Amino acid sequence: RGAEAALRAVAVDHRLLGGVARSAPEHHRLCVWGPDTGLPGGTRHMAETDSVQVLQHGVALGIDTFREFRRAMSLAEGQPDKIICHQVGATHQRTILNSLCLPPDRDFTTFRHLGNIGTVSLPITAAIAAERGFLEAGDMVGFLGIGSGLNCLRLGVEW
């Protein structure tokens, strides 16, 4: 759903240039949610996340995916011009930007006022960034998503 929403955020006058998706399903148990079936007749839900391991393995997957994205998109040094990342929090943002050698001023964030809103955070953040003039015509924008499972998507959009 997050990838679908990200594609819908790309307006008619913007062009999807391509992308790369990778997964690391061996880490699928790091974030688990759903009905707690251990209770007879219960409809309670449970959620468990090993946030330290999600960050560690997510960043490793993110680095590999970004490396492949840069190669597949034939990105010039210094590209993408702007980035919109999955919005989790300050620690995750700082860690992934440092790991990818991306300067923080290229990233637009919303987690400080919207919080972690899951799979819709990337398209909502892109819409707000566009509305506020952060994304400019001609920018090569990298949409960078990492989610539990672990799954990683990198899209290149000509703004």
How would you label these PLM feature ranges?
Residues 1-60, 64-67, 146, 159:
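Condensing-enzyme catalytic core mediating Claisen C-C bond formation in acyl metabolism
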Residues 6-7, 69, 73, 129:
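Hydrophobic helix-cap positions at the C-terminus of alpha-helices
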Residues 59-66, 77, 81-159:
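Claisen-condensing/thiolase-fold acyl-transfer catalytic domains that form or cleave C-C bonds
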Residues 38, 72-75:
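Short, conserved, surface-exposed binding loops centered on an aromatic residue
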